[in-house]
Amino acid sequence: MRAVMALSGGMDSTALLMRLLAEGYQVSCLSYNYGQKHSIELERASANLSYLSKNEYIIDHRIADLSSAMGIFHSALTTDGFDVPEGHYEQEQMKQTVVPNRNAIFASILYGYALSVAIREETEVVIALGVHSGDHAIYPDCRPEFYKAIEHAFNIGNWDSNMVSFHLPYIAGDKESILRDAIISCERLNLDFDTVFRNTNTSYSPDSMGRSSGRTGADVERILAFHAIGRKDPIEYVDDWDIVLERALTIEKEH
């Protein structure tokens, strides 16, 4: 079985990679430098791929540099002087973290890559993405209807499109269910869950040492997910775990 996926270095795509490997897929990963303000996610992705390699899971990984084009897009994630908002991940101000048309661009490149692999290797290929229900409120390009429409358009616009299809296993789930799935995958692969997720970044505003602030919407969602499964997040935060957890729980209660 063959898969092509987007690996951001975040929690969701990392869990997806574990799932695909546990299911027996041969996986090729694309990461994107889209002009984001920090490269911590890409560094963490590389660290995880090195860990996988040491455990004899070899992943074909490429980084697509889109920074010259997407770096001029207006978003709190790409625009200097535009601060990343803090608070609950479904609050209105979190729309400031939307990068215009980002997932359409990413999906288009992935589709072309997957179709090329399918033709070259004469096999069917799935395009795997870690989008989930927690993103639906703020990010319209993470919703099921978006991927249904864009897959339809890509199918119309390409020969041999019957050889590729989108695979969105988390589309109806949330970060808690993603972590629970990852626990199972890591056990099947004989990998250490904490090591895998220590090599991830979810924060939109990590400090210069790569530590997560614990204050952005993405941080809060991640912290609450780890709390829900009864585990301490293995990444390093600017504040102690008890402090960031208490803050996240307060934000959740107030929301």
Protein language model regions, located:
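Immediate flanking context of iron-sulfur cluster ligation sites
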Residues: 191-214
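Conserved residues at the C-terminal ends of beta-strands
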Residues: 130, 206, 222
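Charge-dense, low-complexity polyampholytic segments
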Residues: 127, 199-204, 231-239
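ATP-dependent adenylation/nucleotidyltransferase module used to activate substrates
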Residues: 1-193, 219
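Iron-sulfur (Fe-S) cluster-binding segments and ferredoxin-like electron-carrier domains
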Residues: 210-245
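Iron-sulfur (Fe-S) cluster-binding modules
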Residues: 244, 248-255
